[in-house]
């Protein structure tokens, strides 16, 4: 569909977009405590945040307000078994934006901030997004961006396996639709709307088949 024409009133739409306003407490922590504040400081600002939250974002804040500290507040043990949901990675582009072309620094920040909210694949997804966003400032092609995310996370984690799969299927000649179906078929247990790994796998497919966009 066509992109809507811009109107000034659209700026207020961000107030209802949790993948935008949820980064505010982290940026406030960096502003006040420095670029390399620790996860306890990030957690303190998340605990005091006031926006409407859902999912593991809300669970983590509730845990913090009960006196729990990172990384326990975001752990699967204390986050209703859902700590691998996508909440952190849809917000994690800020980690790369504040570290233009400094991929390792973006990864470091994402590791600390991510454990305030999630655990495991949720954090790995955020790290991959942070790395790709940081690399995008100087990358000359999409492959460089894709590889920055792919190689920023452990080879044995689920998110990395999905990155490996989609590039292998692309190189084997699969079309966009075939690749999309292959990913869903290989990982049926993760084929739901909140899975951090699966949703980031879809992002990876979009990068690979976007003709440089």
Predicted regions and their residues:
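Active-site cavity-forming subdomains of large catalytic enzyme subunits
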Residues: 10-18, 22-126, 138-139, 143-145
């Amino acid at each position: 569909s066509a992109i809507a024409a811009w109107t000034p009133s659209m700026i207020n739409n961000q107030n209802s977009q949790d993948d935008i306003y949820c980064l505010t407490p982290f940026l406030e922590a960096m502003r006040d405590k420095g670029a390399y504040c620790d996860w306890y400081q990030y957690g303190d600002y998340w605990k005091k945040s006031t926006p409407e939250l859902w999912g593991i974002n809300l669970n983590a804040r509730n845990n913090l307000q009960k006196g729990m500290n990172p990384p326990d507040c975001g752990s699967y043990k204390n986050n209703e078994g859902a700590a691998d949901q996508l909440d952190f990675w849809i917000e994690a582009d800020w980690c790369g934006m504040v570290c233009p072309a400094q991929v390792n620094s973006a990864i470091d920040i994402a590791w600390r901030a991510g454990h305030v909210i999630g655990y495991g694949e949720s954090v790995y997804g955020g790290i991959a997004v942070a790395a790709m966003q940081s690399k995008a400032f100087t990358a000359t092609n999409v492959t460089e961006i894709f590889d920055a995310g792919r190689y920023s996370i452990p080879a044995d984690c689920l998110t990395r396996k999905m990155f490996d799969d989609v590039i292998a299927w692309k190189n084997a000649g699969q079309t966009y639709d075939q690749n999309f179906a292959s990913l869903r078929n290989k990982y049926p247990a993760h084929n739901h709307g909140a899975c951090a790994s699966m949703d980031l796998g879809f992002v990876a497919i979009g990068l690979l088949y976007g003709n440089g966009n």
